[in-house]
From Swiss-Prot:
Gene: ftrC
Active site: C58 (nucleophile)
Site features described as Increases the nucleophilicity of the active site Cys, chain residue numbers: H87
Enzyme class name: oxidoreductase
Expression induction: Dependent on photosynthetic conditions. Expression declines about 80-90% in the darkness. Re-illumination up-regulates the expression to normal levels. In the presence of glucose, expression is down-regulated by about 20%.
Entry similarity comment: Belongs to the ferredoxin thioredoxin reductase beta subunit family.
Annotated protein name in UniProt: Ferredoxin-thioredoxin reductase, catalytic chain
Keywords, ordered alphabetically: 4Fe-4S, Disulfide bond, Electron transport, Iron, Iron-sulfur, Metal-binding, Oxidoreductase, Redox-active center, Transport
Length: 118
């Protein structure tokens, strides 16, 4: 394992911890298909490493660096903080048809999805 891999795993673990704690704090849940959750957390970790901030990975940006500075789409984004609306389906309210009952995700699930994306 290279030092880059170690850093990637630390960032992925940090984003996992953030997502789990935020879901519990806001009474939201992960998608019933945890692979959706894993892809979003992996995207947040990648943006955290590349841009220094967990920019929403589910949107298209003309200028990611400008978006990071703007902070509107940094996770948790403004729509999530204000209205519990998560475009990525990472944080779902209990009444959402796609909401599961999990507020935790196994690290193995994240690693499997990350490996399948490589």
């Amino acid at each position: 394992m290279t030092s880059s891999d170690t850093q990637n795993n630390k960032t992925l673990a940090a984003m996992k911890n953030f997502a789990e704690q935020y879901a519990k704090r806001t009474d939201t849940y992960f998608c019933s298909d945890l692979s959706v959750t894993a892809v979003v957390i992996e995207g947040l970790a990648r943006h955290k490493e590349e841009l220094g901030s967990p920019l929403c990975p589910c949107r298209h940006y003309e200028d990611k660096e400008a978006e990071v500075k703007n902070t509107f789409w940094n996770c948790p984004c403004v729509p999530m903080r204000e209205r519990k609306e998560c475009h990525c389906m990472l944080f779902l309210t209990p009444d959402n048809d796609f909401a599961g009952d999990a507020q935790d995700i196994p690290m193995e699930t994240l690693e499997e999805v990350k490996a399948s994306m490589a």
